[in-house]
């Protein structure tokens, strides 16, 4: 059978990746080498239940799994989900409009080698008091790609403590709920990469950074009086690259893009734009390289040698990319659609919220129709025929010549593998 064009392109990309196997084509930064559940078993999520056989909670409760979906829709959870080590979650495999998890938060503490893609995690006011929508306090090598995170009751997405080698890329970190309303703490010496993300409608901590950090091609919109990028505000030493980002003031914004730096925060800065005028046009300008423009941090002249992006966009390119592709963008849900519309109002729309009902809650999703999968190995029969595997034999976890499993080859063919 003739291979489809997307699958042919995907196979070619994987063949080139043999010598330097990253989590998936397009994985970058400190967390790019996460292996997920590649050496384990497949788990197919077959229902939208909070718990039990076939549920997402059950899927991530054991180590060494690649999780795919034969169902789409909103999964309502009452308690936090705790993810085990070496788990891959491939939300792009869900039919219909994909997966939203709503009602409480997730813990990735000690979830070494996690790979998480194309899923929406929306906590909400009914979630655990004082908890993050997503949080990591310990663990090594994790990557989060095209994730939409919102409505945390403490932080929205925080990385703290002994966590190391983490990447968050192509994601949306939105609307931490009032009165706290925080984007997130990024506070570890172990290395965190933040690439091409959107921080939006968080009163403060967009993000608050301490330790070792690469912050490239992000868009920060409508931060509140607590601050946009908060530069440590600490006695601890910090070392960051801050490159090609765009800060756009919105209706809630009353302070400058960078605040609360000091001599302990060492920043290499280059080509960051700031649009403060809320005039309905994207017409910002480059921030001059001075400590005063960057919240009082200590400006350094040489870039830190951290794992960098393959291609550095201009700030304007970053805005175009983020508004089109950030978050669980295979199919944008009603929440992300509203958030992107706020950004594209260029300063005239946006709000800090205390109740997700303001956004219509998590909305409704088309569950779609699962493709036929005779052997139940997570790859639809038609895709197996194209891959050369057997639709009647559970063989999706066999390794392709690229080093990825056939399940990963198929799943990654469903979404773009490059961003430029």
Curated annotation (Swiss-Prot):
GO cellular component terms given for this protein? extracellular region
Residues covered by region (Disordered): 357-395
What are the residue boundaries of the EF-hand domain, all occurrences included? 262-297
Q: Where does Ca(2+) bind?
A: 275, 277, 279, 281, 286
Which UniProt keyword terms apply here? Calcium, Carbohydrate metabolism, Cell wall biogenesis/degradation, Glycoprotein, Lyase, Metal-binding, Polysaccharide degradation, Secreted, Signal
Tell me the first and last residues of the signal peptide.
1-20
Q: Which GO terms describe its molecular function?
A: metal ion binding; pectate lyase activity
Enumerate the glycosylated residues.
49, 165, 202, 394
* PROSITE patterns in the cross-refs: EF_HAND_1
Cofactor: bound how, per the entry note? Binds 1 Ca(2+) ion per subunit.
| Cofactor(s) needed | Ca(2+)
Q: Which compartments does it reside in? A: Secreted
Report if keyword Nucleus is assigned.
no
Q: What is its main location?
A: secreted
For this protein, the Enzyme Commission number is 4.2.2.2
Does Lyase appear among the keywords? Answer: yes
The active site consists of 205
| Reactions mediated catalytically | Eliminative cleavage of (1->4)-alpha-D-galacturonan to give oligosaccharides with 4-deoxy-alpha-D-galact-4-enuronosyl groups at their non-reducing ends
Q: Which domain of life is it from?
A: Eukaryota
| Entry's Gene Ontology BP terms | cell wall organization; polysaccharide catabolic process
Q: Which SUPFAM superfamilies match?
A: Pectin lyase-like
| Its biological purpose | Pectinolytic enzyme consist of four classes of enzymes: pectin lyase, polygalacturonase, pectin methylesterase and rhamnogalacturonase. Among pectinolytic enzymes, pectin lyase is the most important in depolymerization of pectin, since it cleaves internal glycosidic bonds of highly methylated pectins. Favors pectate, the anion, over pectin, the methyl ester.
- Protein family per UniProt: Belongs to the polysaccharide lyase 1 family.
Put simply, this protein is called Probable pectate lyase C
Q: Please give the organism.
A: Neosartorya fischeri (strain ATCC 1020 / DSM 3700 / CBS 544.65 / FGSC A1164 / JCM 1740 / NRRL 181 / WB 181) (Aspergillus fischerianus)
Q: Which gene encodes it?
A: plyC
């Amino acid at each position: 059978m003739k291979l489809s064009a997307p699958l042919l392109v995907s196979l070619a990309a994987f063949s080139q990746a043999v010598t330097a196997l990253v989590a998936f084509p397009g994985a970058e930064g400190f967390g790019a080498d996460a292996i997920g559940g590649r050496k384990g078993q497949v788990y197919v999520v077959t229902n939208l239940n909070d718990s039990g056989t076939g549920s997402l909670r059950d899927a991530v409760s054991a180590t060494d799994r690649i999780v795919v979906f034969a169902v789409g829709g909103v999964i309502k959870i009452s308690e936090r989900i705790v993810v085990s080590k070496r788990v891959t979650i491939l939300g792009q495999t869900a039919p219909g409009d994909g997966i939203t998890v709503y009602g409480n938060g997730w813990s990735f503490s000690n979830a070494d080698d996690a790979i998480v893609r194309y899923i929406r995690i929306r906590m909400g006011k009914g979630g655990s008091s004082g908890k993050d929508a997503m949080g990591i306090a310990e663990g090594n090598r994790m990557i989060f790609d095209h994730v939409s995170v919102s409505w945390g009751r403490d932080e929205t997405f925080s990385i703290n403590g002994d966590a190391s080698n983490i990447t968050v890329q192509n994601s949306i970190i939105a609307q931490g709920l009032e009165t706290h309303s925080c984007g997130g703490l990024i506070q570890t010496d172990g290395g965190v990469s933040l690439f091409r993300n959107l921080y939006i409608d968080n009163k403060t901590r967009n993000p608050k950074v301490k330790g070792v950090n690469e912050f490239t091609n992000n868009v920060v919109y409508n931060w509140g009086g607590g601050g946009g990028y908060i530069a440590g505000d600490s006695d601890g030493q910090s070392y960051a690259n801050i490159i090609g980002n765009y800060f756009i003031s919105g209706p809630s914004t009353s302070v400058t893009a960078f605040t609360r730096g000091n001599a302990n925060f060492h920043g290499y800065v280059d080509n960051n734009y700031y649009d403060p005028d809320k005039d309905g046009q994207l017409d910002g300008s480059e921030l001059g390289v001075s400590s005063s423009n960057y919240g009082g941090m200590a400006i350094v002249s040489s870039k830190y040698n951290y794992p960098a992006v393959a291609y550095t966009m201009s700030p304007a390119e970053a805005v175009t990319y983020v508004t089109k592709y950030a978050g669980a963008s295979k199919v944008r849900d009603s929440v992300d659609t509203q958030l992107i519309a706020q950004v594209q109002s260029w300063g005239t729309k946006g709000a800090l919220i205390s109740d997700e009902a303001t956004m219509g809650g998590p909305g409704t999703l088309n569950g779609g129709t699962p493709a036929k999968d005779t052997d139940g190995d997570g790859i639809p029969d038609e895709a197996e025929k194209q891959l050369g595997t057997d639709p009647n034999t559970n063989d999706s976890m066999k390794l392709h010549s690229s080093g990825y499993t056939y399940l990963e080859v198929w799943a990654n063919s469903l979404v773009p593998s490059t961003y430029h």
